A protein has these predicted regions:
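N-terminal nicking endonuclease/strand-transfer module with a His-rich metal-binding environment
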Residues: 1-175, 180, 184
Length: 184
């Protein structure tokens, strides 16, 4: 079974999310791992996709949208949401979960739960501190880019409109969807 974690961020540095996703990090020090020349080291294996943006220009796309709608200007505003879906390490062997399949599940999850948002979806194979559990990171701009049809979990009429902020809905909805992730 998968576990869902949510982190809200007030940082306006959207590029930091991409850097964390594609480069190796020292989890204890919370810093990038550098080679002997001082360059960041790419992760050994990851899958990366963007929704409503190109993944490698996520930061610029989010900043542009924020300027367009004049949102996310206050330092105390939540500017992005980071969701992590962690699979049990046994899912790799018992359910034949692969990085590719986890990425597909992450994309499905992001499209269903964060429609209209710019998002990065990235699967890591290594797990926290080398635990080996496959996990998917979903980082969304808190500002919705596109109008979308109203979903049953959207609590306010504006929750489906472009230019409005992500409203963290009842986690009951997200957790219900989390348990419905079909591995095979």
């Amino acid at each position: 079974m998968a576990i869902l974690k949510h982190i809200a961020s007030k940082s306006s540095n959207y590029g930091a999310a991409l850097e964390y996703l594609i480069f190796k990090h020292d989890e204890l020090r919370k810093t990038p791992i550098l080679d002997q020349n001082g360059n960041r080291i790419m992760r050994d294996e990851f899958y990366l996709d963007g929704l409503n943006c190109e993944p490698y220009s996520f930061d610029a796309a989010c900043q542009q949208l924020n300027r367009e709608y004049q949102k996310n200007k206050n330092k105390n505003e939540i500017k992005s949401h980071h969701y992590i879906i962690s699979f049990d390490p046994r899912d790799s062997t018992e359910n034949c979960l692969t990085g590719k399949r986890a990425q597909e599940l992450g994309l499905e999850y992001a499209k269903a739960n964060f429609p209209g948002h710019q998002a990065l979806v990235c699967t890591h194979m290594d797990g926290h501190n080398g635990s080996g559990n496959i996990h998917v990171h979903i980082v969304i701009n808190s500002l919705r880019k596109l109008d979308v049809p109203k979903q049953s979990f959207m609590e306010r009429p504006i929750d489906c409109k472009a230019g409005h902020k992500h409203h963290p809905v009842s986690y009951t909805h997200l957790r219900a969807h989390e348990t419905s992730l079909h591995l095979v």
